[in-house]
A protein has these predicted regions:
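Nucleotide-sugar donor-binding/catalytic module of glycosyltransferases
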Residues: 1-217, 301
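C-terminal subregions of glycosyltransferases and related glycan-biosynthesis enzymes
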Residues: 147-151, 156, 171, 177-179, ...
């Protein structure tokens, strides 16, 4: 939670009124400067929620590290963990439906439901991955394949239900600046234990202060982002090397993706070489979108203009 007083009560109500109550609810306040912490404390007291706890971070960790710490804590006991944002609204049967599917199928470690986006005043209209596919039944379960687009996270983290044993397994590979949805999506995709449910069980609020919408295209930010993606690809390779299973095809995808990232990094910090351009063209399908390389050129031109 961070400065969420505007939407918190709606989200808290949707958790409290689930048809299957959660065993416990863990909340971290990331040093909010509004009344978020006091609002939640009062809410817990008013509704007698003895299994709900809230703690305030000792400093502002940011949402990535905060989610990592909370998921680490939540996965101590065996069970199912539901990551939760501060501003969405859960359907009353979200826990019931997703828990039932996970408990019946041991091959699933991460289950993601569809989402129903809605926009507040000022909310920027963006592409929302994970909306209902009207061509499929609501109970359809898709098994995504680890391919050249493996880094593209197609569902938001607030739509996930995750077996705690899986969180414990991947926690040694988890760095503080890795987003929780990326960690959970990509590792379960790699293992073949990710499933996508077509049923919308969360109302996904979009507004002008969504953390996931705050993007920068300046050179420094793009270099940092590419560096983070390189580190992520390396930990995926480490997992492939350290765990049983046939990851030859997946490892090849990860290696090719790393080659493109290195070429993009050379473009931004040292100037593009012919060999780098060849790499980018050869493995172009590993770009998350056609805008990635264009954004690199824009950032490079912008940095040159500012000198």
């Amino acid at each position: 939670v961070y400065n969420g007083t505007r939407y918190l009560t709606e989200q808290l109500d949707s958790l409290r009124l689930q048809t299957v109550s959660p065993d416990r609810v863990l909340i971290a306040d990331d040093c909010s400067t509004d009344e978020s912490f006091d609002l939640i404390v009062k809410y817990i007291e008013e509704h007698g929620l003895g299994n709900w706890t809230i703690n305030k971070n000792r400093s502002n960790f940011g949402w990535r590290k905060s989610f990592k710490l909370l998921l680490d804590l939540a996965s101590i006991d065996d069970g199912i963990v539901f990551p939760c944002d501060q501003d969405d609204i859960w359907e009353p049967d979200k826990i019931a439906v997703m828990s039932s599917i996970l408990e019946k199928d041991p091959s699933i470690e991460v289950l993601s439901c569809a989402v129903e986006p809605f926009y507040e005043s000022g909310g920027k209209k963006v592409t929302v991955y994970g909306a209902v596919d009207d061509s499929k039944p609501l109970d359809d379960l898709e098994t995504p394949v680890f391919d050249s687009k493996f880094m593209l996270v197609r569902r938001p983290g607030c739509s996930y239900a995750v077996k705690s044993s899986f969180i414990r397994e991947i926690m040694p590979y988890w760095q503080d600046d890795f987003a929780h949805d990326g960690m959970l999506w990509r590792f379960s995709l790699l293992k073949g234990t990710l499933r996508l449910l077509n049923q919308p069980l969360i109302r996904f609020r979009r507004h002008d202060s969504n953390a996931t919408e705050m993007r920068h295209i300046d050179k420094k930010s793009r270099v940092a982002e590419i560096g983070m993606c390189l580190r992520f690809s390396k930990v995926l390779q480490e997992y492939c090397s350290s765990n049983p299973g046939d990851y030859r095809i997946s490892s090849a995808h990860i290696e090719h993706y790393g080659s493109v990232l290195n070429a993009r990094l050379h473009l931004l910090v040292g100037g593009l070489k012919i060999s780098d351009l060849g790499t980018i063209l050869k493995y172009r399908k590993y770009e998350l979108s056609n805008r990635s390389l264009l954004g690199d050129f824009k950032a490079l031109i912008s940095s040159c203009d500012s000198k």
